[in-house]
Every structure is written in structure tokens, then in C-alpha cells.
Amino acid sequence: MHKFFIRSFVSSLVLLFTFTVAAIAKDVKAAFVYIGPTGDHGWTYQHDVGRKAVEAAGFKTTYVEGVPESADAERVLRQLANSGHDVIFTTSFGYMNPTNKVAKEFPNVKFEH
């Protein structure tokens, strides 16, 4: 009886978690900003592998590749924030200052550096 209860409880939690994640995924729009091309088989490639896994889980994702660590980064971040993205991942060390600057302008958008 005890094992049955535990199995039922765990199964219920798994189902609840699965449907909760699916419901959240439909509402979250994530963007990734890359320093290089996605086909570089290096830093950017690995980030894009992660992005594709997030997308496979049901989240809406977009990405911009080849963004220099300059004023262009700020411009791209503002465009992504203005286009309805809920979370923006900046994947290069040189994006730190542009990310911090733009994040102050968009308090309802999550920025991950």
C-alpha cells in the first residue's frame, strides 16, 4: 500500500511538472545573442545547442549571430527587448556592459549574461 501511494504521488508530480513546463513554455519568448556564427563548432555552437534544446522543450526562441561587442550589441539588445522577448541571453564576456545598460531600460525583461 505504501509503495502504491508513493508511485501514485510521484507520477502525479511528474505529470503536474510536465504540464506546468509546457504551459510556461508557450508564454516565454527567449533570445540568444551570439558573438560568432552558429556553425563555428566552438563557443557559439555550444550555446546554440542549448538554445535548440530549450526550443525542443516548447519555448519560442530566436537568435542573432555575429554581433560585435560594441554599440551594435546595445542596438540588438534593444531590438530584442522591444520585440517582446521575456529573457535575453548574452553569450560573450564583452556583452557585459551593453547588457547591464540595456537591462536598466527594460526592467520587465530578464537579461542573462
Question: Predicted segments — roles?
Answer:
Residues 1-6:
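N-terminal secretory signal peptides that target proteins for export/translocation
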Residues 8-20:
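Bacterial N-terminal signal peptides
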Residues 23-25:
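Boundary at the C-terminal end of the N-terminal hydrophobic targeting segment
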Residues 27-29, 108:
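Residues that mark the start of a beta-strand
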Residues 31-56, 62-72, 92-95:
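Extracytoplasmic "Venus flytrap"
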Residues 70-84:
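Short, well-structured alpha-helical segments in soluble
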Residues 85-92, 110-113:
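Periplasmic-binding protein-like
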Residues 100-113:
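Extracytoplasmic ligand/sensor domains, especially the bilobed periplasmic-binding protein
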